[in-house]
Amino acid sequence: MSTLMVQGTTSDAGKSTLVTALCRWLIRQGVAVAPFKPQNMALNSAVTAEGGEIGRAQAVQAQAANLAPHTDMNPVLLKPNSDTGSQVIIHGRAVTSMNAVAYHDYKAIAMQAVLASHARLSEAYPVVMVEGAGSPAEINLRANDIANMGFAEAVDCPVLLIADINRGGVFAHLVGTLELLSPTEQARVKGFIINRFRGDIALLQPGLDWLEARTGKPVVGVLPYVMDLHLEAEDGIDRRQIDKAAQVLKVVVPVLPRISNHTDFDPLRLHPQVDLQFVGPGQPIPAADLIILPGSKSVRSDLAYLRANGWETAVARHLRYGGKVLGICGGLQMLGEQVHDPLGLEGPAGSSDGLGLLAFSTTLEEEKQLRNVRGRLLLEDAQVSGYEIHAGVTTGDGLSNAAVLLDDGRSDGAQSADGQILGTYLHGLFETAAACSALLRWAGLEDVQAVDYHALRERDIERLADLVENHLDTELLRELCGI
């Protein structure tokens, strides 16, 4: 069994994308492969079939490997709930919340979970394709590292180092990162990959020759900048949009400090009839057809932030003029009358007034609800699938007019009597073409084009595998993967 690890010189260097590409490339070679990320810090997460929580990037990588997502693919997930602390999720389950200093001491325990998951995957698959986190050259984080070289040393695996040339300084990034590694760690780096290159490769070649001579390590390949590649972002919000049709629906999403699962909006960003705008701090909410209140890892503090930016008033004005409002998960909770956090799960214990737009209240409880679901969106009786990730238990008369009827017999969410407001706990509801079309019609778009988001993602995964085949040294990759 072989393990190959991809590490990056910086965050967003292309690690997630490269692991996705390599997984599909190996599948094309007839080799079963499992993706793996020892430790992930992200507010975008997915739910596995067994009801665990992992990073969404690993769920996409699982799709590339033709596998169902599993908690062993991301044994440690950190979900920030403040500027200095995170909820710690081990093997898909939240075990505690702690600040960065406490977590540094906790890493020895987390490493046990990491190695156990890797061992299980190694027994089940010929190749385990590993994604590092951030950069291996973060000197302050070297002690007790479980995400990069600490893991590579523990399992004795080779490493490829990827850097983003589009940011500039690619040779400094690669050489500097290598110089900051220990001799044994340097020996693990078997080659470099340069990502997002634009222009004539002949102009880059002298630099590649210098890099190989300077380090004694090969350049495995240069990946081109791909303009219209749209895979789910792991961290930052992807604001790119495709060209839009003449008739568009204007959708606005206020960006909250603890926004979670903003990948919910990727299908809208890619829809030819939707003009999706993210509104940041200090910006007014512009005229729109639909305002969506997103998920949040800290609902009460994000409610306070929403009010401080004047967005509560903007939502009320939007409704007076006939606009539609949709709340997803934490956004659903904000639509109600009260949000109670008696245990201090998302910050200081206490209660906050909601927006008071729907007649229910929410209490945060220790046991998190994690499940993949299917059902019918009661708008047009449209089929919908999605996933629940929430600690809130919502009760009240407003739930009698549900938004979704689930196949397991439960109802979900609520609608206002006048039909202007809808809330649901379901993440990913726009990924189902029928539900997306129904929601866009509800928001005011008359002639809706159906878009198959899953087919778009599959197309992009195939394109990534083409890039591996056409731009990387596949013989060296075969050698490193032991195939």
Swiss-Prot record:
The keyword Thylakoid does not apply. It holds the Pfam family GATase_3. The gene is cobQ. Keywords: Cobalamin biosynthesis, Glutamine amidotransferase. The active site is at 329 (nucleophile), 427. HAMAP family: CobQ. GO terms for biological process: cobalamin biosynthetic process. GO terms for molecular function: ABC-type vitamin B12 transporter activity; catalytic activity. InterPro entries: Class_I_gatase-like, CobQ/CobB/MinD/ParA_Nub-bd_dom, CobQ_GATase1, CobQ_N, CobQ_synth, GATase_3, P-loop_NTPase. Residues 248-435 form the GATase cobBQ-type domain. This is Cobyric acid synthase. The keyword Membrane does not apply. Belongs to the CobB/CobQ family. CobQ subfamily. Catalyzes amidations at positions B, D, E, and G on adenosylcobyrinic A,C-diamide. NH(2) groups are provided by glutamine, and one molecule of ATP is hydrogenolyzed for each amidation. Pathway: Cofactor biosynthesis; adenosylcobalamin biosynthesis.
